Structures are given as structure tokens and as C-alpha cells.
Amino acid sequence: MTEISRPQPGEYSAFHARYVALVPEDDLLAAMQAQEAVTAAALGAYAATPDHSYAPGKWTVRQLLGHMTDVERVFGGRLLFIARGDPTRLPGFEQDDWMRAADFGRYALPDLLAEFGAVRRSHLSLLRWLPPGDWTRRGVVGDHDFTVRALARMMLGHERAHLDVLRERYDPVRPG
């Protein structure tokens, strides 16, 4: 296993610090791999009610999972640009605009879970192949510097943040 040391402040934005903080494990790749089953179980519990949301105007479970998959892809794309030494300043994105453009309601929840798992496994494969020197490469997203190792940790932290929201806000008002 390649040792992936923890990113330091300055390798990610203040906004993304919360995602980094949600990943205390030393073995990041093992944690990312193990999380797939946790996520599948947590979201799979809503198989009968994928259009449930915890309040009017809030995302449905199906939309939440679609968002998680979109962000996994975005973070992975940023990570690859930076790992390859591309000097392009990468754009941010507005999640609510993306949600309005997406049509996650047309997909069955099990299919969305399978898609998220496929994207995660693809990223794990990429991460396992990165040379050791790539982990500390820096790039710019929006107005902030990020390293490859920070983006990799943020992938898992973002997933965990949304599972926390699922437990705290969706579960207490889950139908039937």
C-alpha cells in the first residue's frame, strides 16, 4: 500500500475542511473501499421510498444519491487534472444548478447505488495507480489550492457528510 499522509491546512479550502475532518483513518483507500457497503445499506433502506425528503423543497433520497455521485465525479476529475500536473485553473460548480439540470427521478434507487459504486471503484483504481509523488501535487480549483491527497480524502468525507444528513434529518421522518 502507498502511504497517503494526511493533508494539511492550505491543501484545501476552509469550506472543504469539514470533509477532510470526517476521515480520521490512516488507510484512506481501505476506508474508501469499506464505505461502499455502509453507503449501500444506509441508502438501500429507502428502496421503497426513494422520493422521500425530510422537508418540502429539500432533496429526495434519490436526488441526494445522485448529488453524491456527481460530486464524486467532480472531485475525481479535479484530482486527475492535478495529479497529471495540468496547470488549468479548474472551475467550481453550483450544486443546485446541477440538481435542476439532472433528472435523478428517472432512475431506480438500486441503479443509482450501482452507479455510485462503479464511480467509487473507478476512483479507487486510479488512486492505487498514482505514483507516490502525485499525492502532494497542487492545483487550483476556483480560488483555492488543493492537493491530490486532499481531494481523495474529500471524496470520502463528502460521502460521510451526506450520510450524516441522512441519519439526522431523513431517518427521523422516514415514512412507514
Predicted features along the sequence, with ranges:
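Short, contiguous alpha-helical
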Residues: 1-18, 50-95, 121-124, 132, ...
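Short, charged, low-complexity loops and linkers
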Residues: 14-30
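Acidic/His metal-coordination segments adjacent to aromatic residues that form catalytic metal sites
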Residues: 21-24, 97-112, 141-151
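A general secondary-structure boundary signal
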Residues: 24, 35-40, 72, 159
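Generic structural signal for short, solvent-exposed loop/turn connectors between secondary structure elements
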Residues: 25-26, 41-58
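Amphipathic, non-membrane alpha-helical segments in soluble helical-bundle scaffolds
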Residues: 25-33, 58, 62-65, 109-113, ...
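Acidic/histidine-rich alpha-helical segments that form the ligand environment
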Residues: 30-45, 98-136
